[in-house]
């Protein structure tokens, strides 16, 4: 084309695109007679070049016919440039640039192919030369040495090996001008004809080196976008990995049958068939078939026992390892320390006795503190742990237990964790029920007892009477020839305290108390509570080992990490040694008093043990004894006859809540019983109020108060709060409320008895009975029971009372009278009438 032909010329016809799309309509038919009309368009694209013209034959064939000195593979035919589709939107310059790029890409691909072929030839020649040299050395070693012919024979081979690379240079140089002269040269461009390549697909486009506008070459045109899929796509990494895995599997299968892998299968008490198959790396269907052969028709989701699982594991050639759920738990009692690692520890002393006998006052005198003043009502309602340093520098740990009857479990807990029990008995009061209970707790725990006779300075004190009363409970003091130490003390005057400390030191020396501090810590929960600012807090008495900040532990059904340790003086410490009481912060929840704290290796182990214990506790709560039909009906009858008194209990510490629940359960009778909906330590929350509102139950708060949100809900739902700080005030008020639920007590007082002598009509419907009064008197309006042969016929009242024909109010014994009974006419001669009056009294529990 010339420039004049390329110039656009104006015509009188309107500008526009020729129609290249032919449209038609096709009807799609579906089921049930449905049809859909679809418009189909057929696009036509113009092709550059004449329809019958063949592609120009490149002159590279002449170069290809040149003799090659080496048997190199034939060069691939140069691909003729594909007639590019002419787009009406492309200009002539863009079409020429596209042709030039395609030619340049073909030329670069041919050069790259020639370079790779040359490298392969050189490598093959070098390998052949190396093989020939090794062969010559082997021949020289076996035969007689002939040095002259060997280099001469190898010279032609070396020359022949070096010849092919040198001969390929002229071929390539000859091919380049031939390729350049064969391509049709457009105006101001000299495209190069590409060598034919063996692969039919076009390679990835590469940037040309010159002669082209680079800014325009990188632009995305319509033609490039439409022909994008014609280029070769590289395989993704995922496809390569899949191919390698497939090849590896094919090699493994082709190598022969694989040897069966024997596994150690861990089998718990019960396991499903599918889970067992997964652990053995077998198919679940194979296990089901094996069980069917054993006569057990099961599915993969059914559970089998450990013995059946062992048969399956053995049959499939694996090894079994039996485990039990109980193995998850920690058995601290089986871990015994070596005697060489034990070191002396401080004695743990529990002070026990009856209420108001001066236990806390005695401990205050020993500590030099005033704990008793902080207790509500002057009585101890919490179990406290303290350490006292004696004059010789030794340390003694004291546990102060409540003396009230409601705190039985607290006293029992204190006796179980202690080494020595100090029984405090008031000299003027003697032994009381809780004193005797403390003696029984100490005997059950196998703990030695030291008797402290307190209040010897008070008038009416008689210590000798206390010693004599102790003989009734098999406690023989030293003054009477026994082995039980007793000390007369006065907490008020602080007399006899040194003797008491000496007695404790002597008893501890006899017992030789030791523990291993260089091991994981173990301790017992003395008390637990939910603090508003600190969260769950537990008072722990360390039994052995050393508890440190950061230790991970399990405490009952709760787990956690030690965030802080606080001693009995309120100071934070870094660690707690054996026999040391500390407050532990960092629990996941409030544990139960009496639980054991054990330090474990990691959090996963702690959570596993805690979850197992929670599951066991849930099973224990929800487990029910086998119920018979008779038992079911009797339970329903009891439930219908017994009134329930629901309560929600919140206390400051777990021990107090436990004591309140036990005290309220003792108030239950055959007619009414306490139903504890929820009992826990901590402040009264919104959930507590919501629970109480749903059942119309009062909320009992022991040394706790509700938050603002809970008070708001309580005012809206009309929920009652009962606040207490002394436990016997709480039990007294609850007993009154339970009695009020029952209503007044109905008491019957028999007034008189009479015998029916005759029956005669009285009016149209009623019958009158002629009576002889045998005992007491009969009055009008009283309640009466008519009996026949000692069987009650009717319960009624006396509607009318007459003597002869006169109405009277009362008839005494020995006289005859006539009565009309209300609501009954079933009266016969010989019946007996019992007259009584009803008295309503206020109930007491």
Curated annotation (Swiss-Prot):
Looking at the record, the residues that make up the tr-type G domain are: 344-514
Q: Where is this region: Disordered?
A: 1-260
Q: Which GO terms describe its molecular function?
A: GTP binding; GTPase activity; translation initiation factor activity
- Where are the residues of the annotated region G4? 454-457
Keyword entries, A-Z: Cytoplasm, GTP-binding, Initiation factor, Nucleotide-binding, Protein biosynthesis
Name the residue ranges with Pro residues bias. Answer: 68-81
Q: What does UniProt give as GO cellular component?
A: cytosol
What is one Pfam family matched by this protein?
IF2_assoc
Q: Please name the Gene3D superfamilies in this protein's record.
A: P-loop containing nucleotide triphosphate hydrolases, Translation factors, Translation initiation factor IF- 2, domain 3
> Quick one: where's region G1?
353-360
> Where are its TM segments located?
none
- PANTHER family membership: TR-TYPE G DOMAIN-CONTAINING PROTEIN (PTHR43381:SF5), TRANSLATION INITIATION FACTOR IF-2-RELATED (PTHR43381)
What's this protein's name? Translation initiation factor IF-2
What is the gene called? infB
């Amino acid at each position: 084309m010339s420039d004049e032909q390329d110039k656009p010329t104006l015509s009188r016809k309107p500008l526009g695109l020729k129609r290249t799309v032919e449209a038609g309509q096709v009807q799609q038919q579906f089921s049930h007679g449905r049809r859909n009309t679809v418009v189909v368009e057929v696009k036509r694209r113009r092709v550059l070049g004449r329809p019958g013209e063949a592609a120009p034959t490149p002159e590279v064939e002449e170069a290809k016919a040149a003799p090659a000195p080496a048997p190199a593979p034939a060069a691939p035919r140069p691909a003729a440039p594909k007639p590019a589709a002419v787009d009406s939107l492309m200009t002539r310059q863009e079409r020429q640039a596209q042709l030039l790029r395609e030619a340049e890409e073909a030329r670069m691909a041919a050069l790259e192919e020639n370079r790779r072929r040359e490298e392969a030839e050189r490598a093959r020649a070098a390998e052949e030369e190396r093989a020939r040299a090794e062969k010559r050395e082997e021949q020289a070693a076996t035969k007689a040495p002939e040095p002259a012919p060997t280099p001469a024979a190898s010279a032609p081979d070396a020359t022949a090996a070096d010849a092919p690379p040198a001969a390929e240079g002229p071929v390539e140089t000859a091919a380049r001008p031939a390729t350049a002269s064969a391509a049709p040269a457009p105006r101001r461009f000299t495209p190069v004809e590409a060598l034919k390549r063996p692969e039919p697909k076009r390679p990835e486009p590469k940037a040309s080196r010159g002669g082209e506008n680079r800014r325009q070459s990188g632009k995305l045109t319509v033609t490039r976008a439409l022909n994008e899929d014609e280029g070769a796509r590289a395989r993704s990494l995922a496809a390569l990995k899949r191919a390698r895995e497939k090849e590896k599997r094919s090699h493994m299968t082709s190598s022969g049958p694989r040897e069966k892998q024997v596994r150690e299968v861990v089998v718990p008490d019960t396991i499903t068939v599918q889970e067992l198959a997964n652990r053995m790396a077998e198919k679940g269907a194979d296990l089901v078939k094996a069980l069917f052969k054993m006569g057990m028709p099961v599915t993969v989701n059914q559970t089998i026992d450990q013995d059946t699982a062992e048969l399956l594991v053995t049959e499939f050639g694996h090894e079994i390892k039996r485990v039990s759920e109980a193995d998850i738990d920690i058995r601290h009692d089986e871990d015994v320390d070596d005697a060489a690692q034990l070191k002396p520890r401080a004695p743990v002393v529990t002070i026990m006795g009856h209420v108001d006998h001066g236990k806390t006052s005695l401990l205050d005198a020993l500590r030099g503190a005033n704990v008793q003043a902080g207790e509500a009502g002057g009585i101890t309602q919490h179990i406290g742990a303290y350490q006292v340093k004696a004059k010789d520098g030794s340390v003694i740990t004291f546990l102060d237990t409540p003396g009230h009857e409601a705190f039985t479990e607290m006293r029992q807990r204190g006796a179980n964790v202690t080494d020595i029990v100090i029984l405090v008995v008031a000299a003027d009061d003697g032994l009381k029920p809780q004193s005797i209970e403390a003696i029984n707790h100490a005997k059950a725990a196998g703990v030695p007892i030291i008797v402290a006779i307190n209040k010897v300075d008070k008038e009416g004190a008689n210590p000798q009477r206390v010693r004599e009363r102790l003989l009734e409970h098999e406690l023989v003091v030293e003054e009477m020839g026994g082995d039980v130490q007793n000390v007369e003390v006065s907490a008020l005057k602080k007399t006899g305290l040194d003797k008491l400390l000496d007695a404790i030191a002597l008893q501890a020396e006899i017992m030789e108390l030791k523990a291993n501090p260089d091991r994981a810590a173990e301790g017992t929960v003395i008390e637990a509570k939910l603090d508003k600012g600190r969260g769950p807090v537990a008072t722990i008495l360390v039994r052995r080992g050393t508890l440190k900040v950061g230790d991970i532990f399990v405490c009952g059904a709760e787990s956690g990490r030690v965030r802080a340790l606080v001693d009995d003086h309120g100071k934070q410490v870094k660690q707690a040694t054996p026999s040391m009481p500390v407050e532990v912060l960092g629990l996941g929840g409030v544990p139960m008093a009496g639980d054991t704290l054990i330090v474990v290796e990691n959090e996963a182990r702690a959570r596993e043990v805690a979850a197992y214990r929670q599951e066991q506790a849930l099973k224990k709560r929800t487990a029910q004894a086998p119920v018979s039909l008779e038992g079911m009906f009797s339970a329903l009858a009891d439930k219908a006859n017994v009134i329930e008194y629901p309560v929600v209990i919140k206390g400051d510490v777990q021990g107090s809540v436990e004591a309140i629940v036990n005290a309220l359960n003792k108030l239950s009778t055959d007619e009414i019983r306490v139903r504890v909906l929820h009992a826990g330590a901590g402040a009264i929350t919104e959930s507590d109020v919501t629970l109480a509102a749903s059942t119309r139950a009062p909320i009992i708060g022991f040394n706790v108060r509700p938050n603002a949100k809970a008070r708001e809900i309580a005012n809206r739902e009309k929920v009652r709060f009962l606040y207490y700080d002394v436990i016997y005030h709480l039990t007294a008020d609850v007993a009154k409320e339970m009695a009020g639920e029952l209503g007044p007590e109905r008491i019957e007082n028999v007034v008189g008895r009479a015998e029916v002598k005759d029956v005669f009509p009285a009016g149209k419907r009623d019958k009158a009975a002629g009576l002889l009064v045998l005992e007491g008197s009969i009055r009008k309006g009283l309640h009466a029971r008519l009996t026949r042969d000692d069987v009650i016929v009717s319960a009624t009242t006396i509607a009318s009372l007459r003597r002869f024909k006169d109405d009277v109010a009362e008839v005494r014994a020995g006289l005859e009278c006539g009565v009309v009974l209300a609501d009954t006419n079933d009266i016969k001669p010989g019946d007996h009438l019992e007259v009584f009056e009803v008295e309503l009294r206020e109930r007491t529990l």
